[in-house]
Amino acid sequence: MEANFDQILALVRVLAERLGIYLLNSMNPFRIEGQKSIMFEMLDQLDWRVPDWVVLPGGNLGNVSAFGKGLREAKDAGLIDRLPKLAVIQAEGAAPFYDLWQRGSGGLCPVTNPETLATAIRIGDPVSWPKALHEVRNSGGTVEKVTEQEIADAKAQIGLCGIGCEPASAATLAGIRKLTARGVIDRVENVVAVLTGNVLKDSDYIYRYHTGQLEAPGGVKIQSTFGNKPIVVPNDPDKIAELLN
């Protein structure tokens, strides 16, 4: 469709009402109930030891709304004795929630034309921002934004660990680095980095980064800081053996 996420969501809401289609965006409370179970799984995998931070990318802000709710419920049920801090990371070209956080008061000012290669968080008018704001504040957390270069480099380093994620997920690691450099996250603290999307959502991004062809919105060239450039080889076993040796 020739529209961005926010425009498409507005259209879907109209069609859902008109055609009786079930809307499963994060404005739907059942979506939040499902997403909060991610925190129960996380705690179970950590043997119910609470991390100091849970860091995740922020687009429509359903995940952070759900995570906060799930963690509060776990604490109320006596499963944990404290809440981890929630940190939301946005791409700088689509960062209305970060801007709201920096202002400290008032409502969210939508970004009309959000721009970022991290397509999963290319959202200018997140519907779940009131819930998200409550959960981040309640946890004592924070909101940060990162550049396209920071996202690209973080994605490459995640890939070096054998984990395939799409660009929006890499914003998490980029944000952790930034918050650690600023002293917001202490180097001795336990941090859970949530990667929300598989590499197959945006596989062309990898090739363009490693071949030096990746450009940010506006034509700004992304440097292949951790590039692993593909080598084109002939159909010749001797040549291939030579390269492998």
Segment roles from a protein language model:
Residues 52-56, 81-90, 188-194:
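Beta-strand segments within the central parallel beta-sheet cores of soluble alpha/beta enzyme folds
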Residues 60-67, 96-97, 170-176:
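Short glycine/serine/threonine-rich phosphate/pyrophosphate-binding segments
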Residues 36, 42, 47-69, 76:
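Glycine-rich ThDP/TPP pyrophosphate-binding loop and its adjacent helix/strand module
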Residues 3-23, 30, 72-83, 87-165, ...:
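Active-site/ligand-binding loops adjacent to catalytic centers
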Residues 148-204:
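Claisen-condensing/thiolase-fold acyl-transfer catalytic domains that form or cleave C-C bonds
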Residues 25-39, 166-170:
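A glycine-rich, Thr/Ser-enriched phosphate-binding loop motif common to dinucleotide/cofactor-binding enzymes
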Residues 58-62, 128, 163-169:
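Short glycine/threonine-rich catalytic loop with a Thr-x-Gly-x-Asp
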